[in-house]
Amino acid sequence: MPGRLIYLMGPSGSGKDSLIEAARRPLARLGCDVVRRVITRSAESVGEEAHGVSADEFERLERQGAFALCWRANGLAYGIPVQIDEWLASGRHVLINGSRAHLDQARQRYPELLAILLTVDIDVLRQRLMNRGRESAAQIEARLKRSALFSTEGGPVLGESVFFLDNSSELSVTLERFLKLLRSQGISAIQGRT
């Protein structure tokens, strides 16, 4: 039986990377691999476990078919390695840090994906973005404006079958809800794993 793609989305600053890192061990027990994205900026500045490449290298990889999914947002290019297809085919579940604007693209390739939108209170989001110090005030406001397009209403941008997960409070609470959601959607432990 094939594995399932878990497509985690959320605005920059919503805590996706923190949630993914906190969930890494429990996800392994659920038979779920966490994928490293390929991004056109250095890994040190990403704030996530990613593979940083130049724009030229990204384009070369894209032409060679190295990505199962890829998109561009906020002046950067993002790619999900094509190896996830092998993992899914072998029955492994796969978690990726996806893009809200490219959910339809992902659904076309993976119709059974589990879409989860990590949300956060706008004031909390603003403070998180300011605290990390990667963007100017104008860039932060642009990100907040973009985030508003993907409200908890879902609507035509996100389509149907999106689960919303609030990360405005403690990470431990969000982690517990996240794992409960995965189990409720059939992401269960593999026999023999502890």
Model-derived regions: residue spans:
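Pre-Walker A (Motif I) flank of P-loop NTPase domains
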Residues: P2-I6, G91
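P-loop (Walker A) phosphate-binding loop of NTP-binding proteins
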Residues: M9-P11
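ATP-binding Walker
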Residues: S14
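Post-Walker A helix-loop "phosphate-sensing" segment adjacent to the P-loop in P-loop NTPases
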Residues: R25-V34
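ATP-dependent small-molecule kinase phosphotransfer cores
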Residues: R37-V94, R100
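Conserved phosphate-donor/acceptor-positioning beta-strand/loop module used by diverse small-molecule
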Residues: V94-S99, R109-R132, S147
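Small-molecule kinase domains that catalyze NTP-dependent phosphoryl transfer to phosphate-bearing small molecules
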Residues: R134-S184, I190-T194
